[in-house]
Amino acid sequence: MTNKTSLSYKDAGVDIDAGNDLVDRIKGVVKQTRRPEVMGGLGGFGALCALPQKYREPILVSGTDGVGTKLRLAMDLKRHDTIGIDLVAMCVNDLVVQGAEPLFFLDYFATGKLDVDTAASVITGIAEGCKQSGCALVGGETAEMPGMYHGEDYDVAGFCVGVVEKSEIIDGSKVAPGDALVALGASGPHSNGYSLVRKILEVSNTDPEQTQLDGKSLADHLLEPTKIYVKSILSLIEQLDIHAIAHLTGGGFWENIPRVLPQGTQAVIDEASWQWPAVFSWLQETGNVSRHEMYRTFNCGVGMVVALPAELADKAVELLTASGEKAWKIGVIAAAAEGAEQVIINP
């Protein structure tokens, strides 16, 4: 009988000790996100969370998202500390547009070979995003899968659950001609359009770390974390009658604003009401991207659009500005014939 080599999981490329080390590293930052409704801590088979008692008819709202190929850029530039904020932002911003308060968040981190420092940096960013949105990070999955990813490449996904009072759900049904549209400024491209961003960098042979734009590197502009609007929007909803909110993500203006508009209405946007941030002008000029394609791919400096009665528009801008947002009146809702475009951008 020949002696056989004894194989272990680590020999196959999965380091359980590294996974345990990661959990120990992140416990402190995760604890900082805790909400009173959360029961228990990390390590259970499932996370337990009670519904806040202030809701009479609580409706749960859920969402899941990733950060697209912004992640590839972050990996290429070896900047892992803010991509977690992007991940949370993409999920919680989708919830708050329906009037929902984010309750808890879970993440999925998958890699071919677990680098504990990188993973801890990403999850610390996730915890920061949860703190910014008042959301508890209740658990996650770290999957080390040799052969599935190249080297130490990784992917992340986020899952969020929020709650809204049934009578206060914002679904766009109250939108009517004459409503005003108020914009909330974006921090940058957020987490959309990065395949085009990377193509422009490639074709133009641009090094984003060596290219200066408006006083900082292009890399800083492109990796600026997605703005989290949760606290500003929830505060606005408490004080004013909000008819609809659109989160400008993939599909830009053309596809996201119509998602909250009833039939027979259209959003008329005044392009002169704001100036594109420098990064968008650079992308358009360097990539020779058409105006239509820019508005289809990027937020062009507008992270959210709020529809509300015209007489409340000035107050909304005032309240949002007091919350630290850059806000302005960007357009109006008009009546539209059947089959007409639902978004018009007037130069």
Curated annotation (Swiss-Prot):
Q: Which GO terms describe its cellular component?
A: cytosol
- The UniProt record lists the EC number as 6.3.3.1
UniProtKB keywords: ATP-binding, Cytoplasm, Ligase, Nucleotide-binding, Purine biosynthesis
Biological process according to GO: 'de novo' IMP biosynthetic process; adenine biosynthetic process
* Cellular location(s): Cytoplasm
Pfam families given in the database record: AIRS, AIRS_C
Question: According to its UniProt record, which reaction does this protein catalyse?
Answer: 2-formamido-N(1)-(5-O-phospho-beta-D-ribosyl)acetamidine + ATP = 5-amino-1-(5-phospho-beta-D-ribosyl)imidazole + ADP + phosphate + H(+)
Pathway the protein acts in: Purine metabolism; IMP biosynthesis via de novo pathway; 5-amino-1-(5-phospho-D-ribosyl)imidazole from N(2)-formyl-N(1)-(5-phospho-D-ribosyl)glycinamide: step 2/2
Would the keyword Ribonucleoprotein turn up in this protein's UniProt record?
no
State the top-level EC class: ligase
Could you tell me one molecular function GO term of this UniProt entry?
A: ATP binding
Record has ATP-binding as a keyword: yes
Family of this protein: Belongs to the AIR synthase family.
**Mind telling me which HAMAP family this protein's record contains?**
AIRS
This protein's name: Phosphoribosylformylglycinamidine cyclo-ligase
| Organism whose genome encodes this protein | Yersinia enterocolitica serotype O:8 / biotype 1B (strain NCTC 13174 / 8081)
